[in-house]
């Protein structure tokens, strides 16, 4: 098995291939036809029409990476076991180690490794941790000009302007109302940071048989 540093270097090298849509891209399993973008987006939109967060999307799969999500306000986003989403200044907090899963080009789900909960946003723009992967847990990842990423709800947006609800953290680390957040605000700017497996070895035993 390749050393963890080699695995990290490999994943890091792949990230640069997708700057136009963020830091993720798709690799279909061997022997499968790559799903078309329209097919996946269509499935997500059909789920949204079934009611807010009502459709499970556990069948969607793609590239999985582990990262910390650092906000320009100075906090790492973390998902607690009780479903609370908040910021922490602690580097390599167990609840701040997140799995990024590409479900379509430019669309990702974010799951807390330790809590096992997916990042979700409801129709009020509130962030929460979800036990199931639903349409409320799919976000549009956009690579911005300032080298930060933004994450906006794939299903919720303002009807009058079309502006989407954004994942955001306030200056005190509390989650910011996604309906009031905008792309140009630093509350919405996030930087995916690499995870050092040696800092959180308990989270890597099952994934890479790391001991």
Curated annotation (Swiss-Prot):
It is found in: Secreted. Gene3D superfamilies: 2.80.10.50. One of its GO terms (biological process) is regulation of cardiac muscle cell proliferation. Its main location: secreted. CDD domains: beta-trefoil_FGF20. InterPro entries: Fibroblast_GF_fam, IL1/FGF. It holds the Pfam family FGF. Keywords: Growth factor, Secreted. One of its GO terms (molecular function) is growth factor activity. Disulfide bonds: none annotated. GO terms for cellular component: extracellular region. Neurotrophic factor that regulates central nervous development and function. Belongs to the heparin-binding growth factors family. PANTHER family: FIBROBLAST GROWTH FACTOR. Homodimer. Interacts with FGFR2 and FGFR4. Affinity between fibroblast growth factors (FGFs) and their receptors is increased by heparan sulfate glycosaminoglycans that function as coreceptors. This is Fibroblast growth factor 20. The gene is Fgf20.
């Amino acid at each position: 098995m390749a050393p963890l540093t080699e695995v990290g270097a490999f994943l890091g090298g792949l990230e640069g291939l997708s700057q136009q849509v963020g830091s993720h891209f798709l690799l279909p399993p061997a022997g499968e036809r790559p799903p078309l973008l329209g097919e996946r987006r269509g499935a997500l939109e059909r789920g949204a029409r079934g009611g807010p967060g009502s459709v499970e999307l556990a069948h969607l799969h793609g590239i999985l990476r582990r990262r910390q999500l650092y906000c320009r306000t100075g906090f790492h986003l973390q998902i607690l076991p009780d479903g609370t989403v908040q910021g922490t200044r602690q580097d390599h907090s167990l609840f701040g180690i997140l799995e990024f899963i590409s479900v379509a080009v430019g669309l990702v789900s974010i799951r807390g490794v330790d809590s096992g909960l997916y990042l979700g946003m409801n129709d009020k723009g509130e962030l929460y941790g979800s036990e199931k992967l639903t349409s409320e847990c799919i976000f549009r990842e956009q690579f911005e000009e300032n080298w930060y990423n933004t994450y906006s709800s794939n299903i919720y947006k303002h009807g009058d302007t079309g502006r989407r609800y954004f994942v955001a953290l306030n200056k005190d680390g509390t989650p910011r109302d996604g309906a009031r957040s905008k792309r140009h605000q630093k509350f919405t700017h996030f930087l995916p940071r690499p995870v050092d497996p040696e800092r959180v070895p308990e989270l890597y035993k099952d994934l890479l048989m790391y001991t």
